[in-house]
From Swiss-Prot:
This is Bifunctional protein FolD. NADP(+) binds at residues 166-168, 191, 232. One of its GO terms (cellular component) is cytosol. Catalyzes the oxidation of 5,10-methylenetetrahydrofolate to 5,10-methenyltetrahydrofolate and then the hydrolysis of 5,10-methenyltetrahydrofolate to 10-formyltetrahydrofolate. It comes from Neisseria gonorrhoeae (strain ATCC 700825 / FA 1090). Gene3D superfamilies: Leucine Dehydrogenase, chain A, domain 1, NAD(P)-binding Rossmann-like Domain. InterPro entries: Aminoacid_DH-like_N_sf, NAD(P)-bd_dom_sf, THF_DH/CycHdrlase, THF_DH/CycHdrlase_cat_dom, THF_DH/CycHdrlase_CS, THF_DH/CycHdrlase_NAD-bd_dom. Its EC number is 1.5.1.5, 3.5.4.9. Belongs to the tetrahydrofolate dehydrogenase/cyclohydrolase family. It holds the Pfam family THF_DHG_CYH_C. Pathway: One-carbon metabolism; tetrahydrofolate interconversion.
Amino acid sequence: MSAQLINGKEVSQKHLQAIAEAVAQRQQDNLHTPCLAVVLVGGDPAGAVYVRNKKTACQKCGIKSLSYELPESTSQEELLALVDRLNADSEVDGILVQLPLPKHLDSQAILERISPDKDVDGFHPYNVGRLAVKMPLMRPCTPKGVMTLLEAYGIDPKGKKAVVVGASNIVGRPQALELLLARATVTVCHSATENLADEVAAADILVVGVGIPNFVKGGWIKPGAVVIDVGINRLDDGSLCGDVEFETAKERAAMITPVPGGVGPMTIATLMENTLHAASLHDA
């Protein structure tokens, strides 16, 4: 029997609608309109698509968006100066620097320059640290989006064996913290993990984010597991696929996210949610 598909597009639309209603209510209450500043450096086509999607989501929610498209040659000092200006601008609630940045730029230094209360991506060490000590402020968008999806489908991680494959700062590490916060028993797998197939086979909830097409084989999946595929990879024929071998995995899993249409839309919905939250922090 095929797994139930977890429809991130549908869940994200409901969340965007709720955010739009909250923004409209703010305007009725004479509170300022939330504002997101997005910075794109260079002409990376994928980055440009992501930025366009974020602008579209802002329009749907009634959130003001500012766009800064800088040339590939932008220096570290120039980018830091822009971040400083946006930090100081009281009209800007959220700042997002689109990754990856050109190789000559120090991404970590730039992310750390963003004020934690404007860090709507949730990448600042302060925000990751708050999540680690069970006091989240700005939660990383993709991991929080995954938790929202689980909640929407009535999946409670409490007491479940959750396995995260991938230990990146953007997905794997904060995802493990989110699952731990939800009281799952969490295992994180990475490039030094031995017997990966055995670890995957033990998972009640499996979250995979490694950026390698079809990396996790469908036959490894525990029957009845919930599979969340964060990966999105473009194959030579132009088609998109995730990090999990979808066709075989869906015959074993109880629920699974498709790629595209699973986690991706939730990342953007959570970004809008974080921008609204940042605006509420700045009301005082």
